Amino acid sequence: METAVILPPEFWHDGSVWIAEPEPSVESRALAVFARDELRVQDWCFFQTSGTEGARKWVGLTKQALLTSARAVNEHFGITAEDHWLLALPTHHVGGFGILARAHLSGSQVTQLAGKWNASAFVQKCAEVGTTVASLVPTQVFDLVAAKLRAPESMRSVLVGGGALNRELEAAALHLGWPIHCTYGMTETASGIAAQRLPGADMEVLPIWEVSADTEGVLSVRGEALAQGYAICTAGVWRWDAISANTGLRTRDRVEVLEVEGHSYIRFLGRQSGSVKILGELVALGPIQDQIESLKLGLGLHAADAAVCDVADLRKESSLVLAVSGMNSADASRLQKSLNETLRPFEHIHETRMLHAIPRSELGKVMLAELRALL
């Protein structure tokens, strides 16, 4: 069953503070008190960061920041009252909640896909309600491609964010008719920073943002939709870590920033925290994980899961391990062999470990800190 979703117009200026989570908790109630009594703020929303490493933080965004981001996305993709969203992301994540902000400004309809994510149910509902636009994460795109599900004729744009989409998966989705537009953003930027205007193109920086990369390629971003800061709770005590509007946010992402005919473009290279040293060489885990996802498709391992992770190595500083779940030892060996054929010699994986499940976030990101603990 699906439900129509809409926020009352007064939500955006009623002075309330909204805590984004699936169910109320002791922590969120304490955060609401902290926001009211200590921060003394109104018309703010708090979202937990969806990153794969580090301490849990609540990102404080003004409702105006969310609307500013939504307006920029609507303009970039030409979203109007004629469009119909199918909401397949949780609204307690900024990627899902941002859809409600875009719909509020554009007047477009929103239908929420009920129940646990299911690729076939998603396609069926798209066809039933005449969906024209949707936002997905790479794992959902993988499921659509693995099941060889074609896009309904009504679909004109599928915004893919929450993680990098590898080129092979993008090409396979486009071949099935899915009008994929890769996007790049984070909770701290109220969702989008950059997005493809056309499938397969570089991601164009939205005009509300100023971006730069330092000598190490680490991205800094500044703009009017930037978060105010982080609420952090340690041992029951809340503190506030502000983000400077003047200097902006130095992210942990490595990018290439391109300037072409007065427009800025971003190419995502990987997470700064997702790089390890092996025999003195810097190795980015993100591209290796992308290769794993591509190989799973090619080897027909659609129902299985796998992830690369670093472990301490006395001689090499770090070494790589392939963690797998839902596959037998023969399939794991095939995957390991195929993966090693794509890697540099010092990156080669010599050990595979079977797990009950690969720890992933609600949006499908591999949780590296939790995975390391299991290994």
Identify the meaning behind each predicted range.
Residues 215-251, 271, 281-283, 287:
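Conserved ATP/PPi-binding loop(s) of AMP-dependent carboxylate-activating enzymes
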Residues 186-204, 224-228, 232-237:
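Active-site loops of AMP-binding adenylate-forming
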Residues 246-347:
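AMP-binding/adenylate-forming catalytic core of the ANL superfamily
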Residues 29-48, 81-84:
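Conserved pre-ATP/AMP-binding loop-to-beta segment of ANL
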Residues 146-200:
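Gly/Ser/Thr-rich phosphate-binding loop
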Residues 61-71, 84-143, 181:
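AMP-binding/adenylate-forming
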Residues 343-366:
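AMP-binding/adenylate-forming catalytic domain of the ANL superfamily
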Residues 44-71, 78:
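Conserved AMP-binding A3 loop
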